[in-house]
Amino acid sequence: DGILKAKTEMFEQAMPGAQIIVNGDDDKLITLKSRTPKPTFFGLDSSLDLYAEHVENLGLGGSRCDFVTKAGRFTALIPIPGHHMVYNALAGTAVGLALGLTLREIQAGIEALKPVSGRNHLIHTEKWDILDDCYNANPVSMAASLDVLTNALGRKVAILGDMGELGENEKLLHYNVGCHAADDHIDAIFAVGELSRELVKGVQAKDPEGRLICRHFAAKAELLTAL
């Protein structure tokens, strides 16, 4: 609720005629539909102002879907993996329409997307495919990255570190990520850092039989030696 309050401060500061774009699939944000100025809502629900349908998961190759807007519809390939990227593309579509771009221009922009270092950046090497999503990680982004990893072929190894600035619930949030990781059918989980001990506890709680390889390291040097 505190985060919602902070995010809605923009309504109070918005200039007349301002356009505010929010995720309509978010249970908290959808409560803003009666606010002024009226937001534009995006998501996967067909009742929203713009939405995506027929979403096709292409694994590490990204996803393809149809974008439905009041100005028309188009199909686009999102070249960055992860279901959450559909929401990012929807948000970009809403902004593009607000700025007067054509649907063709928006489609071209989506298909030209390139990841930045540390944000869902797929690195191909002779031996491994590495998904680099380490910049300023939070529980939502880490869970999303783990979901992306499940789409990879071959053996899947997650190397996870501490997430900072999570407040008084930091241990529980790390524990929950561990539970999520155990459910994602990853072959091995290596965790490094003090808070990541809780992450390992979450994995072990969901995998009491030890099906997963799960190890904790106090420092990066120990992890590198093990790798």
PLM segments and residue spans:
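Acidic, Mg2+-coordinating active-site environments of NTP-dependent enzymes
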Residues: 1-129, 154, 179-182, 186-188, ...
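Glycine-rich phosphate/pyrophosphate-binding beta-alpha loops
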Residues: 116-118, 134-144
